[in-house]
């Protein structure tokens, strides 16, 4: 059975919501899917004062968890065009896995959330360098996903990966089209992982 990990960091719940949709898409293929999050780095009082959603159901991952999966789908909000520091910190702890080549040949994919759309693709690309160093086979979101080419409304996502636009104040949660793209990406990644691990 194909094993997929959806690994994310979410401050305000947008990426958490997308992670659940990505996982649903992957599960639709019959894959075993786990959802985990990376550790929060902010002191608890600072996080609470900033409105960070601390009560998330997903367990906290450890870097060694990554070796147990055929595919890892990473999710992070945009921070000035890059992944969040919490995700960067987690990936920086995978040096031992890199030295041993433990992630070579696994599928890697990325999804994101932005306030107004700026940084969507650069955030995903900020993952790609690390994933390539580890030897991941990187998978995006192809145009066979019909919602990707639909321009009837403002939405996140690109061929690099699914995304959501939260609004400058964070009040907008993922739309139906963004959810459809997330599910498509999860399904697409799981299907490719199944083919490569057969």
UniProtKB/Swiss-Prot annotation:
Substrate binds at residue 98. PROSITE patterns: FLAVODOXIN_LIKE (PS50902). One of its GO terms (molecular function) is NADPH dehydrogenase (quinone) activity. The keyword Nucleotide-binding applies. InterPro entries: Flavodoxin/NO_synth, Flavoprotein-like_sf, Flavoprotein_WrbA-like, FMN_Rdtase-like_dom, NQO. GO terms for cellular component: membrane. The keyword Transmembrane does not apply. Residues 4-189 form the Flavodoxin-like domain. Binds 1 FMN per monomer. Pfam families: FMN_red. It catalyses: a quinone + NADH + H(+) = a quinol + NAD(+); a quinone + NADPH + H(+) = a quinol + NADP(+). Its cofactor is FMN. NAD(+) binds at residue 12. Its EC number is 1.6.5.2. It is an enzyme of class 1 (oxidoreductase). FMN binds at residues 10-15, 78-80, 113-118, 133. Keywords: Flavoprotein, FMN, NAD, NADP, Nucleotide-binding, Oxidoreductase. Belongs to the WrbA family. PANTHER family: FLAVODOXIN-RELATED PROTEIN WRBA-RELATED, FLAVOPROTEIN-LIKE PROTEIN YCP4-RELATED. This is NAD(P)H dehydrogenase (quinone). It comes from Marinomonas sp. (strain MWYL1).
């Amino acid at each position: 059975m194909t094993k997929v990990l959806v690994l994310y960091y979410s401050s305000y719940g947008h990426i958490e919501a997308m992670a659940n949709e990505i996982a649903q898409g992957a599960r639709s293929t019959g894959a075993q899917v786990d959802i985990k999050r990376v550790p929060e780095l902010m002191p608890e009082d600072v996080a609470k004062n900033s409105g960070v959603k601390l009560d998330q159901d997903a367990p906290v991952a450890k870097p060694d968890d990554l070796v147990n999966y055929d595919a890892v789908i990473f999710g992070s909000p945009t921070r000035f065009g890059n992944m969040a520091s919490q995700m960067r910190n987690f990936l920086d702890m995978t040096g031992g896995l890199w030295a041993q080549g433990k992630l070579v040949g696994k599928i890697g994919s990325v999804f994101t959330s932005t306030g107004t759309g700026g940084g969507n693709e650069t955030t995903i690309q900020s993952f790609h360098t690390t994933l390539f160093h580890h030897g991941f086979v990187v998978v995006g979101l192809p145009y066979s996903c019909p919602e990707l080419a639909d321009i009837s409304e403002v939405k996140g996502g690109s061929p690099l990966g699914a995304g959501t636009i939260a609004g400058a104040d964070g009040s907008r949660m993922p739309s139906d089209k963004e959810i459809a793209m997330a599910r498509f990406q999860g399904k697409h990644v799981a299907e490719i992982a199944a083919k490569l691990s057969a």
